[in-house]
Amino acid sequence: MQTNYFILMHHELIITITIMLLLVIKVGSDKLSNQMVANVTNGLLLASLVLGFILKPEGNVFGDMFHTDGFALLQKNILIAGTLIISLQASTWLKDYEHAAEFYILLLSTLLGMCFMISSRHFLMFYLSLELSTIPLAALANFDLHLKRSSEAALKLIISSAFSSGLMLLGISFLYGTTGSLSFAEVANTIQLNTPLQLFAFVLIFAGFGFKISAVPFHLWTADVYEGSPVAVTSYLSVISKGAVLFVFITVLFNVFALYAHSWYYLIVIVSLFTMVIGNLFALRQTNIKRFLAFSSISQVGFILIGLSGGTHTSAASVVYFIVVYIFSNLGAFGVIALVQGLTGKENINDYKGFYLNNKMLSWMLGIALFSLAGIPPVAGFFGKFFLLLSGAEKGAYWLIAIAAINMVVSLYYYLNIVKNIFIDKSDNSIEKLPIAIQPRIAMIICVIGVVGSGLCGGLYQYIFDLVK
């Protein structure tokens, strides 16, 4: 039985071992280079990812509080792959940083919480995992200790996270008071329609998730947090953290509140519309590229919610597929932005005018990533949004798809505006040729292959759909 526990929890165990190993390395030897710390982290993350595709255990432990199956393993593999890419991208930034080991420890701690959160089948484990995945993020947001805006970002992240966690905890308390259980399965079997307290509990939990994924109207400090955080942390917040919460959101909606499907359909549709429109409108007027990507990510959440509104296996598969595509696309863009900011300090959109003149490889990588985020064929972002809209149309809300299509056209303007700056516009102060270290180069190549390959490989969506069923 003990061996079975280890196999079922191999992701969590490897991440925990990596954290403990980094702590020992940090305490025991100050002479170990940051590059060695990065190599240890990346090596063990890669080992966890490989084992995640080789070992395919299914079962429950801890009194059915922790559940593992093929779908949960896929979600964890996606998050680990994204974290590995971010770790590779951050190596240049952390090369001479005094506290590099602490960065990786915090990064892995929040990843550990996300893995537990995905396997949670009990609200107590879910909440504890949520806090484990959230608290280290505040420290990461404040990692540039010498910058005032980094401290401001951390403070705003703490306040918004505390508020959202409080809403969730209050909702969970009401559920426990009316059902007598915190188990997902037992709550789903006990919950009833037209029970005001249970409906209120659902609204509170939904609002808590809304804060975590930056859906409108719960998005207010998102851009400030993204702008003030280091680029590596911003990319982690926008992709990995948001992806993990969306994975759990699928489980809670479909497994716990399936009885309320008719009610949460309209709620999700309304929130998705506001999220798309407001995210797009604010993205149009941004000059800082990190704030731009913040509102871009808010708009993308609107599309994800449209796909989720279908409430079927197709919906779940389309959301997971889009998150895979979004990880490659967003991290590809952030990889270039991190390099530019780290070496030049520039983060204004106009700073990218004439970028292609001296940095052809980086320009193509950023251009492909932006094409994917815009949903332009044949890159993967087009197919990701196509599957989301197809799922959203399952209930016949073609007007919703029409509004989403209009928003896609609007988003083309601000994505292609950056592409125009890179490839067409000229500047007397264009960015000089930037050196690319081997690890960030590997990360960027992985992202480009992922963006192109996941779009051309039709079997990926089918693979995800089979696991969902």
Where does each model-flagged region fall?
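Alpha-helical transmembrane segments of multi-pass membrane proteins predominantly involved
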Residues: 1-469
